[in-house]
Amino acid sequence: MERSMNFDEILSHIGGFGKFQKILYVWICLPQVLLAFHMLISVFTGAVPPHLCRSNNTTWALPASSDAFNFSLVTGPDDDPDLSCSAPGGVPSTPLAQLNHSTALALSDDHITGVCQGGWEYSKETFHSTVATEWDLVCDNANLNNIGSSIYMFGLLVGAVLFGSLADKFGRRNIILVGLTIQSTFGVGAAFAPNFYIYVFLRFVVGTTISAVIMNAFVLGTEWTGSKHRMLAGIITDYFFGFGYITLAGLAYLIRDWRKLQLAISAPGFLFIFYIWVLPKSARWLMANQRNEEAMDLIRKAALMNGKPLQEDIEIYQGYNDMVKMEERKKDTVIDLVRTPKMRRNSCIMFYLCVSSTIPSLCLSRFVNVLVYYGLSLNISDFGMNIYLTQLIFGLVEMPARTITLFTLNRSRRISQLAFLAVGGLACLLTIFIPDDLSIIRTVLAMVGKFGITASLSIVYVYSAEVFPTVIRQSGIGMSSMCARAGGVLAPIIYLLRGVSKNAPMVLFGLCTLLGAALTLLLPETAHQPLADTIEDVEGSSISEESEEGNMKPALYEECPTRNPDIII
């Protein structure tokens, strides 16, 4: 007996998470490791090691061991002017290697600050070379380092907008391939940059491709996965990103030269050239764009690989093809994200959730780093903590946060998002009531906040892919990613509010996160629900009702009730 099936029913029929999908996930997860490298590499390549100005008459050699030379004597938190930015007007009476914290503070008060004429002397205990040491991005030039990081984050924002729209037009697979190619080429180029400005430009381009690959790999996995396993599209890729987070610590420990490290994380990207032959297109996207024969070929291939071959008489419902052959047909654009009531509500809330999750995540990392810094400044260095171990621990903290979402997402997307945002927001607010001398408790609370925010970030990408319909899904995720990247640009600015009040940043993003938790209640529950393919699917009867009253029914829906073809079996 023949019956029509929508695409989610097709996936269920051929296997929503069979061998075909599992192999696909291998292909979309492998690049995530390199993406983590590119995202976090500036922690090491942009690091500023201990440094002093060489006098024209005297060279101040830095001790080889941190036991003899306290890191806090030459670098302070938040780029405060200190001993490292002082041009020596005379040789201090106390030998540099014997300075303690209080002596250094007294010395810096009397030290003459000016332009360093003799050049900079950098410690090579931790880093052999960095971007900062090669181009002297310290003191008066320190802001260039920060600006470079902001420009890179702006690249992610540009990529989210640019490649989000291009993917809806040219397909997820094509944009992934283009993104990986550009990323590897410009990443390798950055390792040979002749000056800082060219380096920043090359990193900006790499940043745009990060968004291209992350978004489209995620959507490609989502559109090939049945509703029961759809959450894996976000969580599994997050695991591989977390693995890259952890692995980078070891790689950077072994490679202390920034150019060699930049080359080591970029060159392997060329190995993905074989994706041209193995990475499939999205059958759902092909159908939504009337490329039905290609879609059916892929569906048959997936069915055969999953051990559930389709019957030979399967064909695309011809009535659908007649309906879509209109003389003038509306093209879906980014404007459609806010054109209709429910889409407008869902889109605005999703955009806000992306911003309110990203800013606290970045600020919390900085907050914990500053607490660790102050601990080291007070000579609490017997724990053996260093930048490589700290990076490793931060990566490990994210793994349980991503793991717990595997158990909560199956029950509810909406409640899971709400709960983790609430945990993150409350933890942020609680830190302001902890005295400064209880820094360990404040650090633990900050890490709890980071745990909640990390979990919410894992959920929001799964959630957003299900809230937006197929015809504008990539545009919706692209705009969401753009908002998240905007949060990345804003995070350092918000952290500057510490100059007004040390608790201001925590209060601000704690309240913003709690507001996001409340707004989540207005979103639809998407767990175990079929993906919407058209805006009409999202709006339901509201479009028809508004059409009768205000004649605002889009041309797309006048003759075609759905852009997702029915299948006759």
Feature locations, PLM:
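Central mid-sequence intracellular linker of multi-pass
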Residues: 49-111, 117, 254-327, 510-549
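Cytoplasmic membrane-interface "Motif A"-like loop-to-helix N-cap segments
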Residues: 169-179, 231-232, 344-346, 407-422
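Helix-breaking motifs and short loop linkers at transmembrane-helix boundaries and internal kinks
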Residues: 171, 192-197, 209, 255, ...
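Cytoplasmic helix-loop-helix junction between adjacent transmembrane helices
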Residues: 196, 202-239, 250
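Flexible cytoplasmic loops linking transmembrane helices in multi-pass membrane transporters
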Residues: 2-22, 74-143, 304-378, 382, ...
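Structural signature of the two symmetry-related core transmembrane helices
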Residues: 174-189, 197, 239, 416-430
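C-terminal transmembrane bundle
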Residues: 36, 40, 203, 238, ...
